[in-house]
Regions:
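C-terminal functional module detector
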Residues: 1-52, 224-401
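Short glycine/proline-enriched coil/turn segments at helix->beta-strand junctions
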Residues: 108-112, 159-161, 211, 302, ...
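Short acidic/histidine-rich active-site segments
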Residues: 211-231
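Glycine-enriched alpha-helix->loop->beta-strand junction motifs that scaffold or abut catalytic
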Residues: 110-111, 184-190, 210-214, 232-234
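Glycine-rich loops and low-complexity Gly/Arg-rich segments
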Residues: 85-87, 120-122, 137-141, 155, ...
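Short, well-ordered alpha-helical segments in soluble proteins
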Residues: 191-197, 210, 255-258
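A metal-dependent hydrolase metal-coordination microenvironment
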Residues: 25-169, 175-176, 180-185, 193-205, ...
C-alpha cells in the first residue's frame, strides 16, 4: 500500500508540476500594443520580378518532415535519404527539412543547405517555419494564443533565424485568424500554399494593410509513400545560384512563384506516372513585366485563366484561354497580384505589385510595441492570484491536520 501511495503521490506531483508549467508559460507573456496599419500608397509601383531571368527557375521545398524523436513525431515514415531521393527524382534543386522543434544537419555540406525547423506544438496548429535558423525557440503556447503571443513568438524566432514564417495559417479555424494579419509584423514571408491548405485570405489581409509580405509554398510532406505528399505545393525561385543564402535573399525580394500542382484525388497514381505528369505539365513564368501602369504576365504554357487580385482579395480582372494576360493598374489599386491557372489545373501564384512613395520606402514600420506598464501590471496580478491560491491550499491543509 505504501508503494502505491508513493506512486500515486509521484504521479500527482508530476501532473501538478506540468500544469503549473503550462499555466506559467501561457500567462507570463509580454503584452504588446499595436499601431493602426495603413495600406500601400504612392505613385511608385514596385515589381519584384523586374530583371527576372525566365531561364533561371529553381524548384524548392522548405517544408518537409523526416523521422525524429524515435519516430514519435509525424514524419516517422521518412528517412532523410528517402525524402532526398524522392524529391531529386522530381528534379528539385533545394530539398529542405523542417522537423518539429529541431534543426536537421542532413545535407549541410550542400551549398543549397538552409538550416530550418517547424516551431510549435499547440493544439490549434499555430506554427512557424524558422529558416536560416541558428537556434530553436523551445517555448510555445500549447493552449490558446492571443495576438501578443503570436507576435512575441515571431519576434523570438526571428532573433535566432533569418526568417520567421507563419506556417499554414488556415490549417485550423481557431489558429491564425485572417484578422491577425492586419496587425502582425516583423515577418517577411507567409506560407500561402501548403500541402494541406491554401491561405489567400490571410495573405490578402496582410497586403491590404500595407505589410509587404511575399509568399512561400511548402509541401509539408510527412510520408514519402503517399503519392500526394511530394511535389504538390512548393516554390519556384528565380536565381542563377543554388546557394542557401541566395535562395533566402531571393525569397525576401519576392523573386519567387508559388506552385499548386494538382493532386490525385483517388490516391492510386503511381510515382512514375506522377513524375511524368510533373515533367510534362509544370509551367514556368516567362513574363511579369510592368510597362507603365500595365502588368503583363505569361508562362511556358497557355493560360487557361489569369486572375488579377487586389485590395481585400477582390478579383479585379479575369482573362481566359490566352497566351498572355494583362491588367491596367488603376490609381485606386493599392496592390495587384496574379494567379495563373493552366489546362491540367496547375496554378502559379505570383507575388504582388505594390504602391509606394518611392523605391527606397518599400517597408512600413513595425506595428508592435512592448507595453511594459501593462505587462508589469498583468504579471503582478497573476502572481497575486497564484500566491492567493497557494495560501488557501496551505490553510486548508492546516485545518485538516
Amino acid at each position: 500500500m505504501r508503494v502505491l501511495k508513493f506512486i500515486g503521490k509521484l504521479i500527482l506531483s508530476i501532473i501538478g508540476i506540468f500544469i503549473a508549467w503550462l499555466i506559467g508559460v501561457c500567462i507570463f507573456v509580454p503584452v504588446y500594443d499595436f499601431d493602426e496599419p495603413y495600406p500601400f500608397h504612392g505613385e511608385y509601383l514596385h515589381n519584384p520580378y523586374e530583371g527576372m531571368d525566365s531561364t533561371a527557375w529553381l524548384k524548392c521545398n522548405f517544408h518537409a518532415h523526416t523521422r525524429t524523436v524515435g519516430g514519435v513525431a509525424n514524419g516517422r515514415n521518412n528517412s532523410n535519404e528517402l525524402l532526398d531521393s524522392v524529391y531529386r527524382s522530381f528534379g528539385f534543386d533545394h530539398i529542405g527539412i523542417s522537423n518539429y522543434n529541431t534543426i536537421s544537419d542532413y545535407g549541410k555540406d550542400n551549398p543549397s543547405y538552409v538550416p530550418g525547423y517547424e516551431h510549435g506544438y499547440g493544439i490549434f496548429k499555430i506554427h512557424q517555419l524558422g529558416l536560416g535558423a541558428r537556434k530553436v525557440r523551445k517555448i510555445d503556447y500549447p493552449l490558446w494564443q492571443t495576438l501578443s503571443m503570436k507576435q512575441h513568438t515571431l519576434n523570438k524566432i526571428g532573433q535566432y533565424a533569418e526568417l520567421a514564417i507563419p506556417a499554414h495559417p488556415s490549417f485550423v479555424e481557431k489558429g491564425y485568424h485572417p484578422e491577425d494579419f492586419k496587425y502582425l509584423s516583423n515577418y517577411k514571408l507567409l506560407e500561402v500554399l501548403n500541402g494541406y491548405r491554401k491561405s489567400p485570405a490571410h495573405w490578402d489581409m496582410a497586403l491590404s494593410n500595407g505589410h509587404l509580405v511575399y509568399l512561400i509554398g511548402g509541401d509539408d510532406s510527412h510520408s514519402m509513400t503517399n503519392i500526394n505528399d511530394p511535389a504538390n505545393r512548393f516554390t519556384l525561385i528565380n536565381s542563377k545560384e543554388n546557394e542557401g543564402s541566395q535562395l533566402l535573399k531571393a525569397l525576401v525580394a519576392g523573386q519567387a512563384v508559388g506552385v499548386a500542382f494538382p493532386m490525385d484525388p483517388t490516391y492510386t497514381e503511381t510515382f512514375p506516372h506522377k513524375r511524368a505528369r510533373f515533367e510534362e505539365n509544370l509551367p514556368y513564368l516567362t513574363k511579369a513585366d510592368l510597362c507603365g501602369d500595365t502588368l503583363r504576365v505569361a508562362a511556358t504554357k497557355p493560360l487557361s485563366k489569369a486572375e488579377f487580385i487586389g485590395q481585400g482579395g477582390h478579383v479585379l480582372h479575369v482573362e481566359t484561354d490566352v497566351e498572355e494576360a494583362s491588367y491596367v493598374i488603376q490609381p485606386e489599386d493599392q496592390y495587384v497580384r496574379a494567379v495563373l491557372t493552366f489546362a491540367d489545373g496547375t496554378e502559379l501564384w505570383l507575388n504582388p505589385i505594390t504602391r509606394h512613395e518611392s523605391p527606397d520606402k518599400l517597408y512600413h514600420p513595425r506595428l508592435d510595441h512592448l507595453n511594459y506598464w501593462k505587462t508589469t501590471l498583468l504579471w503582478t496580478a497573476y502572481i497575486a492570484v497564484i500566491g492567493g491560491v497557494i495560501l488557501l491550499v496551505r490553510m486548508k491543509k492546516k485545518r485538516n491536520n
